[in-house]
Amino acid sequence: MKTWVREATKRARAPHYGPRLDYGVDTTLLDAALRSAFVQLDCDQETEAFLGTCTGGSWWESLGSTILGLFYSLTDANGILGRGQMFVLSRSQVQRLLHRELPVAGGGGSLLDIGAGDGNVTASLASLVDQVTTTEASAPMVAHLNARGYNSVQTCDLQHEFVQSRKPYNIISLLNVLDRADKPLTMLKEIREMLHPESGLFLLAVVLPFSAFVEVGTQRLAPSEKLPMHGGLCADGASFEIAASLLLRNVLIPAGFKLRHFSRVPYLCRGDIQQPYYVLSDAIFVLEVDGEAQQQAS
């Protein structure tokens, strides 16, 4: 058995080996639509390779993060220090979920990665398209993205001229941003309008159960638009499955999207001197524009 397979098995089954990596769901608690769309993923070689680089940080990094945290958001501080790298999906997992292993047919396909961070996940998507556009609120992260060749603009406004000039997009990804957006409902509407109506796919990752706040400098504020997630909140003690069902039923379908695939993956963050990595549970939705709903709305 390959080493990475042995390591993945240890991480999945032995809590003492590190934070548990959970890819499973209780299908009896899911809505029927989620149950039929569920794609079982697992810890693959690329995921294990990322975990292998998570050796914890130094005291100097920890001290630097603490000092910068007095003046900057956590995202900005991580960008300045070049630490806190995230991992959501491997390239093979993205290809499986999107059912795409080659660039968009005919060439010219385009990707919009909203809140792209340092571009680690963008890299998994970029091979599927010819044109990559990214947005980020953090200036240090924008610098990282542009250095990697991912055309980036510092904005939270999807009506930004640069973003709008490149639509429609064949793929739009919104990975762990919805719960940090000030106006998540408006954002979903704008994404639907920018997505190619026939071939476009919307890749959404959300930590569940749901907990929303907006980073403004060193403050964490409540969003001005609240999603109808009562019963699916972290504060409610909701399960992952119940929260996912509520998000689909109360938010995504009313926003004009149709579900294609659903999965669960660990949302990994490179750690610090306390532990090598941290993990949350991400719900992954692959969606497309619901043409019938759009016609009724118009």
Where are the regions that the model predicts?
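Conserved class I S-adenosyl-L-methionine
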Residues: 107-117
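Conserved beta-strand signature within the Rossmann-like core of class I S-adenosyl-L-methionine
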Residues: 199-208
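A short glycine-rich, Lys/Arg-flanked "PGG" loop and its adjoining helix->strand segment in the class I
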Residues: 185-198
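Class I SAM-dependent methyltransferase SAM/SAH-binding core
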Residues: 118-160
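A conserved beta-strand element that flanks and buttresses the S-adenosyl-L-methionine
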Residues: 173
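A short His-aromatic
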Residues: 176-180
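Short conserved loop adjoining the S-adenosyl-L-methionine
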Residues: 160-166
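N-terminal accessory regions of S-adenosyl-L-methionine
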Residues: 1-107, 120, 206, 214-298
